[in-house]
Amino acid sequence: MVDFQLPLPGLARDFNELTKQEKDFIAYFSAIDMDSISPVVDCYAGIGPKGYNVFLILARIIKIKERILSDRQLAEVLRKNDLYRFVTKDIQPAHNTFNTLRKRLGPDGFVEIHKRFVLKAHSLGLLEPEIPDLPKHRKKGIILVADSTFLITCGSTKGEKDNQGRWRFKDESVAFTGKGHHAHKYPVGHKAHSLKTVNGVPMATIITAASVYDQKAILPLLDELTGRYPDLPFAYIILDRGYDAEEIHQDIYEHFGIIPIIIRKKMVYPKGFTKDGFPFCPWGTPMKPKGIEYDRKRTKYACFKTCQESEQMLPICDYLKEQYRFGYICHTYFTNGYRKFGPALPHNAIYQKLKPLRTGIERTFGLVKENRYRMEETNFYKGIDNVTIHTVEHDIVLTQDIIFDYLTTGKKSPVLKLNY
């Protein structure tokens, strides 16, 4: 907790008169690293009256945390609430100042601010927490989770059909879905596609029309991720069965060097394999995995001489001899099919450990759906750029939430139970 002198300059009340919630609010904003903001806003002239600079960004953070719906409402509460005035150094911008801020910074400016918050989290060890249950001999790096959510826009329910029966909206970047998502039985505008670390830190978000399928967005999303953080190591990405297509398995691994943990649909293996994908030895005994050779893009299997334990031994098998330590050995190659023979198969230990984490994260954290200050319900902006900024602001706040929790409690994740 941050120590303050009493009374606090600019605060209408004595610090001791504040509630615990109000003290925590001040501590939260005092913990924000201004070096994550000031280098960005200093590059843009005219984002507001002289002296506003970083404090306009703090005001945007207040908007997200307090679930303030519009710029006009934000400008009004900044004038009336002494806590808000204190943490923003008593700035009192007009509502159109925030519109100027968005135009001058643009999506790229807000993305750069978020990037600096993420790198701050990385310096604290929050992107790669040690997860004790994972295999020790795994690829080292950041574990990612991807998901998407619909965003209702202020123009999405005011569409009109043209002569060809197509929907037209005042905001041309939105789309209309006649059937709707299983959780959204109403017209929607945009879709936010997000990548998070397995412990909940948002890494990147892109916005598309709601009609764009998740499969079409995952590669551009990974392009955005690796472009933002070229020096960070990414090891695995956990995806649901909606992404289970051969080209996605292959492209993620080949283009980005990330191992996809994709929940599989039903698979049928060719002759010579068990129904679970284990190859048979020449004498019909199921083999066991011995390791994955990523550099050679293959998985090694061995029989481990299990037939010796069988009542019907095979005396003709030369691989029972002493010089064959693990018995008969064979390989499957990624290039023969990444879904069936790729770098992370359903029977691999890392797959079995990471797969349940996705379900747990969705339930506990809701990814972009529930615990992001109702991002999908609080968007009142038109245009792809403004909607993108809206989502990036939520990413900034959520990243700072995790940083603040770590600084005050030592907790590295709001979604994983890490016993250390």
Specify the residue positions occupied by each region the protein language model found.
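Charged, often Cys/His-bearing segments associated with DNA-binding zinc-finger transcription factors
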Residues: 1-38, 406-409, 413-416
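Basic, short loop/linker segments at the boundary and entry of helix-turn-helix/winged-helix-like folds
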Residues: 16-67
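Residues within the helices of the helix-turn-helix
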Residues: 72, 76, 96, 235
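DNA-recognition alpha helix
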Residues: 73-87
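Major-groove recognition helix of helix-turn-helix-like DNA-binding domains
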Residues: 87-105
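Polybasic low-complexity intrinsically disordered regions
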Residues: 105-254, 263-265
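An anionic, glycine-rich sequence signature occurring as long contiguous blocks
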Residues: 254-255, 259-361, 366-380
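Basic, amphipathic alpha-helical segments enriched in Lys/Arg and hydrophobic/aromatic residues
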Residues: 351-420
